[in-house]
Regions:
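Regulatory N- and C-terminal appendages and interdomain linkers associated
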Residues: 1-16, 294-317
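An alpha-helical support segment within catalytic cores of ATP-dependent transferases
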Residues: 4-19, 132-191
Length: 317
């Protein structure tokens, strides 16, 4: 049973001694696996309390705290990331953490104003430039291209088992996974779950949260959300912004498109699992539309531009 906002406020007060919280509201919709609330203090600052509800959320919270240690030096006038305020345990030995919380506005993909996603691209470039060695020391998960490819093959098989994913899409994705050249990239530190729940804007600043999915993996994973909802021109502008800060292999955008398509099937599978028929129907319709475009050869190619990625070419030269 989910904890009430009063219990969460009491736990927050214990974790963040010295803070005087004056109001509390539940925030469980955007924090699956956690009991969560947003609190406001007598100094008008906002905070988020997170309480784990099982082994999976315990592991995710551990990653979140380690990730924040890694990413906090990047906080600046253009990037807001949560600050760890305090920690404790509740009577069930569940972890309780209080983080700073900045309210933000949603980033509208496809909007004429591309500045927010350009800002996101720039900050992703900085996150992707973080030290992999430091991430390893913090025990953040590390996936090689081979590991990730195997995981994706297994996931596509499970999505196929739902019987809801059109065959033309499964064939498209399986062909992409078999294209060795497409998966030539340098594993980097990534956020791991960029979407409307984890990024937003506050004035000229990007607000980023949800670092519990951070890992060392494919940088293209962080561009799946952008690739799935932006115009081609906006995507190219974002990629250009990214390349001003760090290098990328020439197939990053193709893999981002791959991830954006697979994410629809993931969402469909999740909706079926939780019994949300309406959301599942909508996701199924999106997949059918995607399948129609695939049959008409109207989807971007997922075929690798070359066998050897940009970074590997430069490493070997």
């Amino acid at each position: 049973m989910a904890k009430s906002h009063l219990i969460l406020a009491a736990l927050a007060a214990e974790a963040a001694r010295g803070k005087n919280f004056t109001s509390t509201r539940l925030n469980t919709e955007k924090t699956p696996g956690f009991d969560s609330a947003i609190l406001e203090s007598d100094t008008d600052r906002k905070y988020q309390v997170l309480v784990t509800t099982g082994k999976q959320s315990e592991a995710e919270l551990k990653t979140e705290l380690n990730a924040l240690k890694l990413v906090s030096p990047l906080a600046s006038s253009t990037l807001s990331v949560p600050e760890i305020i305090g920690e404790t345990k509740d009577s069930d030995d569940s972890s309780v953490v209080v983080l700073s919380f900045d309210e933000s506005k949603d980033i509208r993909l496809g909007a004429k104003n591309s500045e927010p996603i350009q800002l996101l691209s720039a900050e992703l470039a900085r996150i992707h430039s973080l030290s992999v060695a430091d991430a390893n020391e913090l025990e953040i998960q590390n996936f090689s291209p081979t590991d990730l490819n195997a995981e994706l093959v297994s996931e596509i098989d499970k999505l196929a088992d739902t019987g809801k994913v059109p065959g033309v899409l499964l064939s498209r994705w399986e062909k992409a996974l078999e294209d060795i050249g497409l998966w030539r990239y340098r594993p980097t530190v990534i956020h791991g779950s960029i979407n409307s729940d984890t990024v937003g804007t506050a004035g000229d600043k990007l607000v980023m949260r949800g670092f519990g999915t951070m890992r060392v993996s494919d940088p293209a994973e962080d561009f799946g959300w952008i690739a799935g909802g932006s115009t081609e021109q906006a995507i190219n502008t974002c990629l250009a912004q990214y390349l001003e800060i760090r290098e990328a292999d020439e197939n990053l955008l193709k893999r981002a498109i791959f991830y954006s398509e697979v994410e629809i099937a993931r969402w469909l599978s999740y909706c079926i699992e939780i019994g949300d028929d309406r959301a599942a129907e909508a996701a199924g319709a999106d997949l059918e539309n995607l399948a129609e475009d695939a049959q008409k050869s109207e989807l971007p190619s997922l075929e690798a531009t070359s066998f050897i990625g940009l970074n590997q070419q430069r490493d070997e030269s």
